[in-house]
Amino acid sequence: MVRRVVATGTFDILHPGHVLYLCEARKHGDELWVIVARESTIKHKRKPLIPEEQRLFMVQSLKCVDHAVLGSETDMFEPIRQIQPEVIAIGFNQHWNENELKKQLAERGIKAEIVRIQTSDHSPYASSRTIRQKIKESDP
């Protein structure tokens, strides 16, 4: 049986921190599925600069990613229901509360182990926010 891992994110301004998160997530199974957030569903931070189809293309191009899909515009759990992962990998700085996520998954009959990826690249360029700020600062 193939052990599927799901990772999620916006992946706006793809950077080394994203790549590290996805490669570490891949180590928890045989197949890495990535759900790329849709612009219409992002509520907790600013809207992406890069259109969703281009973000999806960039994530699909990474060697450690086996499959990448856009998230649902109506139910964030729908792609997870379709993929049926054994593991859901959460990034070290993602806003999820693991216990709340487990509860929401259980309410939907989804059984998956939740793993928080602790590894991060401490480079100043491992944050989309920092990259945006550096671009603003360099603009004459």
Curated annotation (Swiss-Prot):
Its cofactor is a divalent metal cation. It holds the Pfam family CTP_transf_like. Keywords: ATP-binding, FAD, Flavoprotein, FMN, Nucleotide-binding, Nucleotidyltransferase, Transferase. Gene3D superfamilies: HUPs. Pathway: Cofactor biosynthesis; FAD biosynthesis; FAD from FMN: step 1/1. The keyword ATP-binding applies. It is an enzyme of class 2 (transferase). Its EC number is 2.7.7.2. SUPFAM superfamilies: Nucleotidylyl transferase. One of its GO terms (molecular function) is FMN adenylyltransferase activity. ATP binds at T10, F11, H15, P16, G17, H18, N93. One of its GO terms (biological process) is FAD biosynthetic process. It catalyses: FMN + ATP + H(+) = FAD + diphosphate. HAMAP family: FAD_synth_arch (MF_02115). Homodimer. Belongs to the archaeal FAD synthase family. NCBIfam families: cyt_tran_rel. Catalyzes the transfer of the AMP portion of ATP to flavin mononucleotide (FMN) to produce flavin adenine dinucleotide (FAD) coenzyme. This is FAD synthase.
